[in-house]
Design a protein with these regions (language model features):
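Short helix-coil junctions and helix-kink-helix linkers
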Residues: 233-235
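Catalytic cores of RNA-modifying enzymes
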Residues: 1-219, 248-252, 259, 268-275, ...
Length: 297
């Protein structure tokens, strides 16, 4: 790769040295940076949230295409340098913050798109965090190829897991292209890929189901080799009879394992358990409630 295809790096651009403790690997290939910006399909009016702008290589492109740009940078030194760099840009805000502590929707204060070269050691937490409504209209991430493979994995495969299911319940994930290690400074030791996540027009879940669904899925994949009967007994503190009734209501065999269930099947389990709880509550109310016996003692 010739030098003219790369952005300035390190001290030559006046930036502080790379901090390995923050998992910093700066993308320097201008062609790939351009492809990432293209993948956002910006029209010039959008609010763009950029996670981890680093030295501003992608930011330089986005400021010319976005209506408003909010860059979230954890590294204090980089955040200050970026503020100075874009001080004359009225459409740019540099937010010095931990992205996991920020409500993305509140920060955007309206519709937004999301992009980021996220630190690989916290990629999964960031992806989960970005699923919290109000979600981006579309998101483009530079991630480990392993994560990209997990996002598109099929049930029953090794890569299939909680991340796969939670994203698929509300959005479509697609791998756009891979990125060689030589496109970064310093080069990472893993393969990378660019993925785009777009909300589904008709998601599997209604908003009030999303949090209990996420807890169910993450809990289940913590026991991915256990039978679903055992999973429900552990997660919901119910006996085998109730667990089997719930699974029967979802048309799932009690012996099935979490790693074989589709996102739609997890949604059925959640609703079957909710229906079972509502029926039990109704039965208790019809019988006068458990407190009557206690009151008579």
């Amino acid at each position: 790769m010739s030098d003219d295809a790369r952005t300035p790096r390190g001290d030559r651009a006046g930036f502080p040295p790379t901090r390995k403790s923050l998992g910093q690997h700066f993308l320097t290939d201008r062609r790939i940076l351009g492809r990432i910006a293209d993948a956002l399909h910006l029209t010039g009016s959008e609010t763009v949230l950029e996670i981890g702008p680093g030295r501003g290589a992608l930011t330089d492109i986005l400021v010319e295409r976005a209506g408003r740009l909010i860059a979230i940078e954890y590294d204090r030194a980089l955040a200050e340098l970026l503020r100075q760099r874009y001080a004359k840009r009225n459409n740019v805000l540099i937010a010095e913050a931990d992205v996991l502590e920020v409500s993305l929707g509140e920060l955007a204060a309206g519709p937004y798109v999301l992009v980021g070269n996220v630190p690989y050691y916290i990629t999964t937490p960031i992806l989960f965090h970005a699923l919290v409504p109000p979600r981006a209209e579309r998101s483009v991430y530079l991630v480990q190829k392993e994560v990209a493979d997990r996002l598109s994995a099929a049930p029953g495969t090794k890569a299939y897991g909680a991340l796969t299911v939670n994203v698929a319940a509300t959005a479509k994930a697609e791998t756009l292209f891979t990125v060689p290690a030589g496109a970064f400074a310093p080069p990472p030791k893993v393969e990378s890929a660019v993925v785009r996540i777009t909300p589904l027009p008709q998601p599997l879940l209604v908003p009030e189901e999303e949090r209990p669904f996420r807890l169910l899925v993450q809990g289940a994949f913590g026991m991915r080799r256990k039978q679903m009967r055992r999973v429900l007994r552990s997660l919901y503190a119910v006996d085998a009879v109730v667990a089997d009734e719930v699974l029967q209501g979802a048309s799932i065999a009690p012996e099935a394992r979490p790693e074989t269930l589709s996102p739609a099947q997890f949604a059925l389990v959640l609703r079957a358990f909710r229906d079972r709880k509502q029926k039990l509550a109704g039965d208790v109310m019809d019988s006068g409630g458990p407190s009557q016996a206690a009151a008579g003692e």
